[in-house]
Amino acid sequence: MSRHKVYKAISSYVIIAIIIIAIVAVVGVLLLTRHPSSSSVTSTTTPTTSSSVSPSSSGPVIVYVAGAYKAIFDYLAKQFEQQTGITVDVVPGGSFGLAAQIAKGQPVSVFVPVAYIQAVELEGNRDPGWAIAFISDQMAIIYSNYTTQSPYWNQLYSNYTMAMKTNESQYWYNFFYLLTTKFSLGISNPSSDPEGLYAYLILKMAGYLYANHSFDYFINLVNHNPNVVSAPTTADFVPDLATGKLDFTFSYVSYAISQHLEYLKLPPWLSFGYYPNETSWDSFFFYKITVNGQTLKIYGNPVYLYITIPVNASNEQGAIEFVEFIVDHVQELSMFGVTPITHPLLFYQNKSDVPSQILNLLNQGVLQYGGNFSAV
């Protein structure tokens, strides 16, 4: 074979080899583009947003809590984060208003309404069907040192002290009459905030007891007092109380303590504290509220703080751990002026709705069964 032919054959083989290498390289690039490595997926994937709520096992634990108890949950969140490393975001507001937000699909892990278990049912299709009552509180009439400078303060306070000492109806009548006509008074919206609902129930009780069984007597006085103001939550009144622009509001004892405000304690039959002898009396009174276009007749009951996990909760596993943590640390909360329930009460509509971890606490005797929602 001549040198020219050999050279031509070698050249042909080289060209074929180059073509094969090029084809392999192109195919390899295409495969890498279509099938990135697992480490590439982890580093480049970003969460997508959706209008529907779906459960998640990561991210912070988002706690929707009745606004008066924000200080308690700021404390619990810090302790929980230190113990588990899981971040907790505390979102305060009126219980009924928060329930409405949850029903509309807002992301939330844990819901902590106060006073009325109906707030759990107002979550709509995210109602989990269960809740735990873990502390009790009671209503009081809140004020600041500025209030004591009012020209009617001495008259009001003397009637209050005599009423608490003697329980004579005339002193109580004088007290509530002065409160509702001679002072500026903040009452939160009863359709968004249970504190406002309790305020109107207390006024109905006072009218029935001290104004010839007239349920609406003191409510009518409030409605005709131009110095009575409303707000979505009681927290909205705190700045004006602290600066003397507002004289009084109705709130929980624990909230007054957490805000370093003064308060007038109410007797058991007006405070909605957990007094077993008063529960049937409390439930004799009702007030109508409207939430999401729905009118509800709400009967009086003790001030409980509930905790539950809505359906399709964000970071559901973290939410369960947070609930377990609270049950385990409930006795610590007495420093906030509330009464811990030694064996918190588990309420549910159907046992099958309750997470297995929560049922285990019931079976172990850590929780006690409180009944279905209608029992509250």
From Swiss-Prot:
<feature type="signal peptide">
    <location>
        <begin position="1"/>
        <end position="31"/>
    </location>
</feature>
<comment type="similarity">
    <text>Belongs to the bacterial solute-binding protein 1 family. WtpA subfamily.</text>
</comment>
<dbReference type="GO" id="GO:0030973">
    <property type="term" value="F:molybdate ion binding"/>
</dbReference>
<feature type="region of interest" description="Disordered">
    <location>
        <begin position="37"/>
        <end position="57"/>
    </location>
</feature>
<dbReference type="Pfam" id="PF13531">
    <property type="entry name" value="SBP_bac_11"/>
</dbReference>
<dbReference type="GO" id="GO:0015689">
    <property type="term" value="P:molybdate ion transport"/>
</dbReference>
<keyword id="KW-0732">Signal</keyword>
<dbReference type="InterPro" id="IPR050682">
    <property type="entry name" value="ModA/WtpA"/>
</dbReference>
<protein>
    <recommendedName>
        <fullName>Uncharacterized solute-binding protein STK_20340</fullName>
    </recommendedName>
</protein>
